[in-house]
Amino acid sequence: SFHFGNLMALERDEGNGFGPILSSIAFPAAGIRAVGWQGGAVLHRNALGITSENPMKVRECNRVEDATLLVTSHWTTSEQVGDSRMQTLIDRAKLYRTWGDCFGYFAVASGGADIMIDPDLSYWDVAALIPVVEGAGGVITSTSGGNPLKEKSAVCTAGGALHEEVLRALNA
């Protein structure tokens, strides 16, 4: 599948424990790779021997009603986050798709979606997502609003008011 991805993160101890400082989300079959770091993210494309490199940026979206919402699995998300709360978000979103895993985070970071929710992640899954998402201007926390590396869940959004709105809905 074109959206099978490879994740890689480089960590460094900045004085408060190890955390990711540089990462990559790559989709080899599609010839695309996102690289993120504190303060930036870039999209590399290699198609038919032609290589291009462009800055990545989340798109402007401030309301769930205007958002494209992605999850890895509807069943897993509903079971673990709480069916009625998740269903309310689904009903409010402009568009809802169960097309997640690392492609969902890539979609938010590259401006193709606005919200990605994953209630069950491993450390090695989320570590590579953080620099790419944040470097593109997005926000990524756990579903409770905490550190996704420690709580092993993630809410990724285009940022600001949208992120707060999603967290309020999930934790109501």
Residues of each region from the PLM?
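Short, surface-exposed loop motifs enriched in S/T, G, D/E and P with embedded aromatic residues
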Residues: 49-58
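An extended, acidic
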Residues: 57-172
